[in-house]
Each structure stands twice: as structure tokens, then as C-alpha cells.
UniProtKB/Swiss-Prot annotation:
A Pfam family matched in the record: Chorismate_bind
GO biological process per UniProt: L-tryptophan biosynthetic process
Source organism phylogeny: Bacteria, Pseudomonadati, Pseudomonadota, Gammaproteobacteria, Pasteurellales
Superkingdom classification of source: Bacteria
Stored NCBIfam families: PRK07093.1
GO molecular function: 4-amino-4-deoxychorismate synthase activity
Source organism: Pasteurella multocida (strain Pm70)
Record-given protein name: Uncharacterized PabA-like protein PM1464
Protein family according to the UniProt entry: To the C-terminal of para-aminobenzoate synthase component I.
Length: 324
């Protein structure tokens, strides 16, 4: 399905108040949309803030979760990092989300990871990938659209971790940039856009311990009958600013040059429309089945203040599964 066809179908479903599920890849080449009741038939199983379509129960894992990481070398990461830094220094980008795959071994199957992880937005695409995302893309209800850009993480066990996170010049600049980008994005589809919460801290539990992350809340007003434009609204906002960067169009070109491989559904979006409201997520925290291997996709925001070692370690730190 083309993106144009997706937009038309989503707008039609929205106008009819027909509940539907959708999934759009980062490159916007393989969008999927279907009536909500048909998602399971396509092998798409979701659990999104209390709404889920899982009609099966996988056997409980017999052993505690184990995860072994085999990240790319620092030299391989540095090639992409250096390319990005050159573009930042030229002023072609101010913030860029650089991602790479990490091969992993685990004693759980993808469907077990899906059922046992804790995250507000979960998706299992049978035999293809599992996603357990903490990050909202946009939520729409009562004619208001919300987004919650998430930028800035730190190991929660470090001394004064929250203070270090909030006081970091690099993390502050990164967060200001993404909030400004997302505020401008929302202004293309909504009115009276405002930041209603700025840089609040949340804790996420992982199998290796807790991490802290900072988010903000941005809100705008939509016109009546926005449901009839739901596909147009989603497409206008793509790709998600938090996993691309600013300015968006040029930054995406740099991403393709640095990463040298398509992201596919990783860092795309997925969600559901229940007939009145929409909930959606950015497809991060993502394990993909590639032939006989499992690949965990992760990354982080790069600014001109970024240090190679810090960013390389963040890439590895984000390879985690929120279980237990």
C-alpha cells in the first residue's frame, strides 16, 4: 500500500467512525491499515494503554529472562557519528537521531517478550518483530491533540542521577530542540499549540536496573470532525521528530547516509482509532527477527555537543527489555 492510499483509507475510516489499526514504517513505503477486528488475522497483536486484541496465551517462560548483547564496534559506530558531526558543524542539522542494530541472544521467544514486558505501547507482528515502546507519537481525544517528546536518559543508579540529567547542557539542548520541532509540527495540523509540561522525569525499570528519562507534553486544538482528516494529520507529522531530528527533511537525508540501511518499521509509528479517539506510539524498543538472528534496534540524539564514547554507550544501554 502506498502512503497516498493509506491516507485515503484512514480518512474514510475516520469519517465513518470505523475503528482501525495502523502501522507505518520510517520510510513510509509499507503502511498497513485494517479494521481493528481484522488486525489479529494479519498477525498483528497490540496492547495499547489498556486496549488489546490478544486472543491467545503463550506458555510462561521456564527461566528468568536473559539477554546477551553483541553491539557493533565502536569504530563502526564512529564512522556514522563522524559523518553526522560534520553535517552538524555545517549547520545542516541541529539534532539527529542516529541508530544502529545490535545482535542479541535471549532465552525467550518474541511472543513471550511481548506478553511479559511492561510498556504502555506494545506490538507483536508475528514472526517479524516485537516492540515495547514507552513513547507516545500523538494521542487525540476531545478535539485535542497531544504529543510527549522523550529526549534525555541516564542510569538511575548513578549518584544524583536526576540532577545530572536535568543539569546536562547537552541533554537540555537536545530536549529544547525536539520540543521546538514537535511544537512546530503540531502547529501544521492544530491551533493554540502550547507546551503544558516541560522536561518532567520518569523512571523506567529494565532487566538490568532503572533508567531516568525526560519528556514534555505539548497540546493543540483540532477542528471539529478531525476524524475525517485522520490520515492526513498522521502523514503530515511523519516521520516522528524524536527519532529523526531538526530540520526534519535534511536530517532524514543525513540519517540515510550515516546508517546506510533502511529502518523499516523501527522508528515508524503504530496505533489505533477506536471510532472517536486515537492513540499512537513511536516504534522504539524494538526486537526484529532477521533470518535466524534477533536484532535489537536502538539509538540516540546527536548534537554538536555530543561525545563519541557517551553516545556509543547510550546506544548499548538502550538495548534492554522492561521485564519484572
Amino acid at each position: 500500500m502506498s502512503l497516498h492510499a493509506f491516507i485515503q483509507q484512514a480518512n474514510q475510516f475516520g469519517e465513518q467512525r470505523q475503528p482501525f489499526f495502523f502501522l507505518i514504517d520510517f520510510e513510509q513505503q509499507q503502511p498497513i491499515i485494517c479494521p481493528l477486528a481484522q488486525a489479529a488475522e494479519l498477525g498483528l497483536f497490540f496492547a495499547i494503554r489498556g486496549q488489546q486484541n490478544v486472543n491467545w496465551q503463550t506458555e510462561m517462560p521456564h527461566k528468568p529472562f536473559e539477554l546477551h548483547k553483541f553491539p557493533i564496534s565502536k569504530a563502526a559506530y564512529q564512522r556514522g557519528f563522524d559523518l553526522v558531526q560534520k553535517e552538524l558543524q555545517k549547520g545542516n542539522s541541529y539534532l539527529l537521531n542516529l541508530t544502529y542494530p545490535t545482535e542479541i541472544n535471549t532465552n525467550w521467544r518474541l511472543e513471550q517478550v511481548f506478553q511479559q514486558t511492561t510498556a504502555p505501547y506494545k506490538l507483536y507482528y508475528r514472526d517479524r518483530f516485537v516492540c515495547f515502546s514507552p513513547e507516545c507519537f500523538v494521542n487525540i481525544h476531545h478535539n485535542q491533540i497531544y504529543t510527549y517528546p522523550m529526549k534525555g536518559t541516564i542510569d538511575a543508579t548513578l549518584p544524583e542521577a536526576e540532577k545530572r540529567l536535568l543539569d546536562s547542557d547537552k541533554e537540555r539542548q537536545e530536549h529544547y530542540t525536539i520540543v521546538d520541532l514537535m511544537r512546530n509540527d503540531l502547529a501544521t495540523v492544530a491551533e493554540k499549540v502550547e507546551v503544558t509540561r516541560f522536561r518532567y522525569v520518569e523512571k523506567i525499570q529494565t532487566q538490568k536496573g532503572a533508567i531516568l528519562q525526560t519528556s514534555s507534553e505539548i497540546r493543540g486544538d483540532l477542528a471539529e470532525n478531525w476524524q475525517a482528516r485522520i490520515g492526513t494529520i498522521l502523514a503530515t507529522l511523519l516521520p516522528a521528530g524524536s527519532i529523526s531530528g531538526a530540520p526534519k527533511e535534511k536530517t532524514v537525508q543525513i540519517i540515510h547516509a550515516a546508517e546506510q540501511r533502511p529502518r523499516g518499521y523501527y522508528t515508524g509509528i503504530f496505533g489505533l482509532f477506536d471510532g472517536e479517539s486515537l492513540q499512537s506510539a513511536v516504534a522504539i524498543r524494538f526486537i526484529e527477527q532477521v533470518d535466524e538472528k534477533l536484532i535489537f534496534r536502538s539509538g540516540g540524539g546527536i548534537t554538536i555537543l555530543s561525545e563519541l564514547e557517551d553516545e556509543y554507550q547510550e546506544l548499548i544501554q538502550k538495548v534492554y527489555v522492561p521485564v519484572g
